[in-house]
Amino acid sequence: QWDFFDLPEQWTINYKNLTFNLKPFSFKHTGLFPEQATNWDWFSEKIKNANRPVKVLNLFAYTGGATLAALEAGAMVTHVDASKGMVTWAKENAVSSNLADRPHYDAIIMDPPSYGRGPKGETWKIEENIFPFIELCTNILSDDPLFFLINSYTTGLQPAVLSYMINTAIVKKFGGHVTAEEIGLNVTSNGLVLPCGASGRWEN
């Protein structure tokens, strides 16, 4: 059963020290994927415990949840998204979280769409492009990388597939180890977990 209610045009929520500006969209997004908090906590600890400056590249970065978490942990972050509106929104979130003045790759985070088009009509199909893209990304990792994180909402990219790709592209080059698992949100009313895709993590 669905409960419907009126939403404000825009509102803010907080997660730890981060503040996010949310607004409803016709395509069912609000500007935040809260299930990603488990990944934010994971890489924030790695950044804080690195005991060195950490440069992070966040690809398909949307409104900047992972960007803000990495900034707040002390990293320097380059935020990349094809949508100019999403980049503007990410900047607004950075201002709200008092992180706008931090300097803009020991780590890469990516949240690729299943399908997309670039500003010049380029086509992105995750089944065809994701593995070559991961391989290209290994060329811009530092000599001593800290972590690599891939999120997937695509049915065909299950944890085992993510693990295989990361092992093939990254472990053979840098060593380290890989974990991959489904992620979800706890449903408080019945104790079940709402599936929200999968994540693959590499760490040194």
Stretches with model-predicted labels:
Residues S83-I109:
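S-adenosyl-L-methionine
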Residues N51-Y62:
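Conserved class I S-adenosyl-L-methionine
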Residues P34-R52:
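Conserved alpha-helix/loop element of class I SAM-dependent methyltransferases that forms part
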Residues M76-D81:
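Conserved SAM-binding motif I beta-strand of class I
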Residues T63-A75:
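Conserved SAM-binding loop of SAM-dependent methyltransferases across substrates and taxa
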Residues Q1-L32, D41:
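Non-catalytic substrate-recognition/targeting regions of SAM-dependent transferases
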Residues P145-N204:
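C-terminal catalytic and target-recognition region of SAM-dependent MTase-like enzymes
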Residues R102-V171:
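S-adenosylmethionine
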